[in-house]
Amino acid sequence: MGIGRAGARTLDLGTGTGTIARSLAQRGCDSIGLDRSAPLMEEARRMDREAGVTVRYVEAAAEDTGFPEASFDLVIAGQCWFWFDRPRVASEARRILKPGGHLVIAHFDWIPLPGNVADLTEKLIEKHNPKWKLGGSLGIHPRCLADMALSGFRRLETFSFDLDVSYSHEAWRGRIRASAGVGASLSPEGVIVFDRELQALLAEKFPQEPLAVLHRVFAAIGKAA
């Protein structure tokens, strides 16, 4: 499809610490990252310097980027689509894409199968945070297609694949502590209690390291007319 080739002008929405924007820059793209969090983008700049790449960062909302019409060959949203006002962001992406440009919505989710580490971790999150309702995902997101179609994107495509991701116990605990259901929801004391229970669960149920945590990559792609 020729998406993200060297020389393409690309915009990474909800860039955070710049993982996707940095990867695009490493491919030779004219890469811009956009986020509402200045501290996260400052960390992204530090990581860019270590990687030896240059990315421009813009502090703005994905719903109102401030860029002129037909500015980009590629707009990408990784791990952030459902935090946005989706119809507004899809329309904004359509506005700022060049004719023939692409919007890519990507997700990378752990997959909770009965008794695996993701399943038992989710059950522990639900125990400590009953209001958390994001568990049980199959890692397939058809709503992305509706969002694209309603905003005028055509030639919609999806793909997905599974892979095991290796984590040490410490790294898995760190990822879960930073997740929306724990670090963004529990009190500092609650996070400590949760983390101790997760540490004990891993030691009892999954003592071997590294952990092999099943994940699913899903992407939806739409073309601007």
Give, region by region, the residue ranges found by the protein language model.
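A short acidic, Gly/Pro-enriched loop at the edge of an enzyme's catalytic core
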Residues: 63-74
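Class I SAM-dependent methyltransferase SAM/SAH-binding core
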Residues: 9-13, 17-64
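Conserved alpha-helix/loop element of class I SAM-dependent methyltransferases that forms part
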Residues: 1-8
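A short, conserved alpha-helix within the catalytic core of class I
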Residues: 84-92
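Conserved Class I S-adenosyl-L-methionine
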Residues: 142-225
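Short catalytic micro-motifs in class I SAM-dependent methyltransferases
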Residues: 79
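Conserved catalytic/acceptor-binding region of the Class I
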Residues: 94-165
